[in-house]
Amino acid sequence: MNVFGTDGIRGEVDLRPCGTRQAIDALVDERRLTLPLAWLAGQALARTLDAEDAGVVIGWDDRPGNPALVHAVQDAFLAAGWNVTLLGTCATPLVHHVLLETKANAGVMITASHNPVEDSGLKVFDASGRKSTPEFEVRLTRTMLDLAQEDHDLLHLVGDRADGDHGEDRFEDAHADWLHARMEDLSGMFPD
């Protein structure tokens, strides 16, 4: 079993409370993305990578359910002792850029790209900024299934906020500077 599709985990956002076992079933059987499922994904990523002094970069787009999903993913990483950098509402390339700039261990972009607005999803990136491999996603799924068998008190996830330092201003400027520098590198390829 693999809860990941071709580009991460995606489903219709469902903010109603449910247990972790029900969260897995809701995604697999009904394509519903719940807060406990987002938490399981964050915990699974933290446990699978198991890095010392680990850090994760989290960005999201402006879909209605995303602040609550961000809170769930953030909570999972904080519970695992990870440093969390919240980028705020941003484009996926900013997650890649900040991931590489900060030398974080992982990145998560909360979006469903071209899917309907009521959907969202989790795209996972490794320390090199690459999309997770199918083999790694199977490992994450197994860890999520194991975690779902444990009892977790996740009622505190109900809500729609993302706490913490949102570094979007600091990182958007750095990303813009990086893009300008790249364009200057390519300027010789184009005639005036």
Regions found by a protein language model. Give the residues of each.
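Bulky hydrophobic/aromatic "packing anchor" residues in well-ordered structure
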Residues: 7-9, 95, 140
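An N-terminal, well-structured beta->alpha segment
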Residues: 1-73, 79-80, 168-192
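Ferredoxin-reductase
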Residues: 46, 50-132
